[in-house]
Structures are given as C-alpha cells and as structure tokens.
C-alpha cells in the first residue's frame, strides 16, 4: 500500500483485471482506469503508508483464488527477510502470499538493510523480485541462486 505499490498502480495498463489492495492511494489511482475492478480492503488504518489491514481479511480472502500476488515490503535483510511495521499487515501479506500461485515482490534498493518488526516472507517464498537499478548486484545474484527471477 506504500509508494512502491503506488508507482506500480500508475504503470498498470488499463486492462480487464481484478485488483485487491489495502492501499488507499493505490485504490484512488486504479479507480481512474476504466477496465480495472478495484477491491479495497478495510480495517485498521496504518498511518505510515496510508494502507489498511484487518484480521478479518483472511475471512474475506478465504474463497478467493489468486493467480498472482504483487506485494511490497517496507524493509529487507537476507537474515530477517521481507518485513513491515504492523502485525496485522504482515498477517495479511503472509495470507495472500500463501494463497497465490505466483508471488512478485516489489522492493527498491532504499529498503535493503532495514528491519521492520514483522517478517511476512523470505526470499524462497517469492518467484520474482522487481527492483531498481541501484539494487546491489551481489544481492541480485543471491536471489538468482534461489531460482528467483530478478527484474
């Protein structure tokens, strides 16, 4: 629901698809696209990134099937994995990650070396890493060694 997800929403083509988001700004951006159906999750407002999360999200998604989950993290270290600042958000991301056939992680280089309180995924839990040019080559190689596509 943060800035990385917002950049993705801006670049998403106006194509027929269903998007589930907990990001308020992401939902606003996607609402401008005629062919995109936007499902905004409710719950606790996480003020740091203007997203929402709720323990009820698991019930909401219980019968929802995801071909692809495109998620982002607030922080990453190889030791701690992908993390965020709210337990309820970590629970939501973990649940969605486990339900999806494929998981794409958006992580820009500014998040590397940072640790947030709640880990929701490890490198082996994702299929594709989407990052920026400043992402360290040595870290890219570590992902590739685990058969993770780096874009």
Predicted region positions:
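Helix-turn-helix/homeodomain-like alpha-helical modules used for DNA recognition
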Residues: 1-14, 21
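Conserved phosphate- and dinucleotide-binding cores of soluble alpha/beta proteins
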Residues: 20, 24-151
């Amino acid at each position: 629901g943060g800035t990385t997800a917002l950049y993705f929403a801006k670049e998403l083509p106006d194509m027929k698809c269903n998007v589930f988001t907990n990001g308020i700004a992401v939902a606003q951006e996607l609402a401008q696209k005629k062919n995109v159906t936007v499902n905004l999750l409710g719950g606790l407002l996480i003020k740091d990134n203007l997203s929402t999360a709720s323990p009820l999200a698991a019930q909401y998604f219980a019968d929802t099937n995801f071909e692809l989950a495109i998620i982002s993290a607030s922080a990453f270290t190889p030791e701690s994995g992908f993390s965020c600042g709210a337990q309820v958000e970590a629970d939501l991301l973990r649940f969605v990650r486990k339900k999806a056939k494929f998981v794409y992680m958006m992580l820009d280089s500014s998040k590397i070396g940072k640790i947030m309180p709640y880990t929701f995924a490890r490198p082996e839990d994702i299929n594709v890493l989407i990052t920026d040019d400043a992402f360290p080559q040595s870290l890219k190689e570590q992902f590739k060694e685990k058969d993770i596509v780096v874009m």
